[in-house]
Amino acid sequence: MEFRGDANQRIARISAHLTPQMEAKNSVIGRENCRAKGGNPGFKVAILGAAGGIGQSLSLLMKMNPLVSLLHLYDVVNAPGVTADVSHMDTGAVVRGFLGAKQLEDALTGMDLVIIPAGIPRKPGMTRDDLFKINAGIVKTLCEGVAKCCPNAIVNLISNPVNSTVPIAAEVFKKAGTYDPKKLLGVTTLDVARANTFVAEVLGLDPREVDVPVVGGHAGVTILPLLSQVKPPSSFTPQEIEYLTNRIQNGGTEVVEAKAGAGSATLSMAYAAAKFADACLRGLRGDANVVECSFVASQVTELAFFATKVRLGRTGAEEVYQLGPLNEYERIGLEKAKDELAGSIQKGVEFIRK
Ligand SMILES: NC(=O)C1=CN([C@@H]2O[C@H](COP(=O)(O)OP(=O)(O)OC[C@H]3O[C@@H](n4cnc5c(N)ncnc54)[C@H](O)[C@@H]3O)[C@@H](O)[C@H]2O)C=CC1
Ligand SMILES: O=C([O-])CC(=O)C(=O)O
């Protein structure tokens, strides 16, 4: 009988949390009184924009990451549904959902890593810069929340245009007095994933064996694959270089056009974001030699931000690597990339300083 009593109490507790009344009473969407806390030692991760195309798949992938103990899913719509769904996966991370601006602070408090895929995606005919008008304000608001509630968190910024949203985030953090350049990382991992895939196709290799550094930024000509530095060392014909560079630079547009109005890359992007977040968490844990490309504050060129390989450690991007030797084709590409990047960075900075 004692056992039955305990079990009944447990069931009553759980059922109570399933009622809409209780959900409404709770400031967060979760199961606060349940015993099952996962109990994993690990990191606390928030996804802002978790109900979107990228956000949903990314939530699934982060729920599967053994380094995550607590996963906060925030969005202005549909966060409860995504949270309920993902929370039934029998992996270690405990999942809590947060809906709307009033719950942003709860979503962010105590987080080690904040991943931001919030904002509108492109439709055919648009550039990433066409998203600035709407996404700049979204990123500003969310980063103000980060500065207030988890100023020491690592931020992985996905929302486009990354070439401008990263400078916007930096300015927000500077204004709040919390800016640590090592902790603000623009996510360019999808460019590397595409480059590895397309180069592997040309070379007839497994993409997992290929490593292509992609530097610069995350839009059109600012995406600069360094094919002269591909591992394993490989040579390409001028036609192959032209084909690969164009395909990598226009990979996002290829998906936007194929989706024909239904958005941009979400599945490959969630994969890339999960890979990059995992690298950040391994760095936070103290693993050695965690190296990824990312758009960060940089002294590699005269620009304030630039994507190169960075070494991720306990405090974020602890080392920003130089470009290494470039061939003539890449030197010309670098000048074009810098010209466009300069304007995009300036636009982001001015959005906050105006
Ligand atoms: N860095 C990269 O390599 C890539 C970046 N992106 C960018 O990621 C962003 C998201 O793309 P999708 O997931 O496809 O778009 P989506 O429209 O499917 O999802 C965006 C989500 O953000 C949410 N949202 C809007 N305002 C918000 C706010 N203030 N706070 C929290 N959430 C908010 C929406 O409710 C929606 O659930 C776009 O800007 C897109 O261009 C997309 C692919 C690659
Ligand atoms: O192209 C877009 O709009 C989305 C994006 O950044 C990408 O897929 O690389």
Swiss-Prot record:
It is found in: Peroxisome. The keyword Oxidoreductase applies. Its main location: other. Its EC number is 1.1.1.37. The active site is at H218 (proton acceptor). Keywords: Glyoxylate bypass, NAD, Oxidoreductase, Peroxisome, Tricarboxylic acid cycle. GO terms for molecular function: L-malate dehydrogenase (NAD+) activity. It is an enzyme of class 1 (oxidoreductase). One of its GO terms (biological process) is tricarboxylic acid cycle. Residues 10-18 are annotated as: Peroxisomal targeting signal PTS2. Disruption phenotype: No visible phenotype under normal growth conditions, but the double mutant plants pmdh1 and pmdh2 show seedling growth arrest 5 days after seed imbibition. It catalyses: (S)-malate + NAD(+) = oxaloacetate + NADH + H(+). CDD domains: MDH_glyoxysomal_mitochondrial (cd01337). InterPro entries: L-lactate/malate_DH, Lactate/malate_DH_C, Lactate/malate_DH_N, Lactate_DH/Glyco_Ohase_4_C, Malate_DH_AS, Malate_DH_type1, NAD(P)-bd_dom_sf. GO terms for cellular component: peroxisome. NAD(+) binds at G49, A50, A51, G52, G53, I54, G55, D75, N135, I158, S159, N160, M269. Expressed in rosette leaves. Pfam families: Ldh_1_C, Ldh_1_N. Substrate binds at R122, R128, N160, R194. It comes from the Eukaryota. Belongs to the LDH/MDH superfamily. MDH type 1 family. NCBIfam families: MDH_euk_gproteo. Catalyzes a reversible NAD-dependent dehydrogenase reaction involved in central metabolism and redox homeostasis between organelle compartments. Peroxisomal NAD-dependent malate dehydrogenase involved in fatty acid beta-oxidation. Reoxidizes NADH from the beta-oxidation and provides NAD for the conversion of fatty acyl-CoA to acetyl-CoA. Does not participate directly in the glyoxylate cycle. Required for maintenance of photosynthetic rates under photorespiratory conditions, and carbon flow during photorespiration. Homodimer. This is Malate dehydrogenase 2, peroxisomal. It comes from Arabidopsis thaliana (Mouse-ear cress). The lineage of its organism: Eukaryota, Viridiplantae, Streptophyta, Embryophyta, Tracheophyta. The gene is PMDH2.
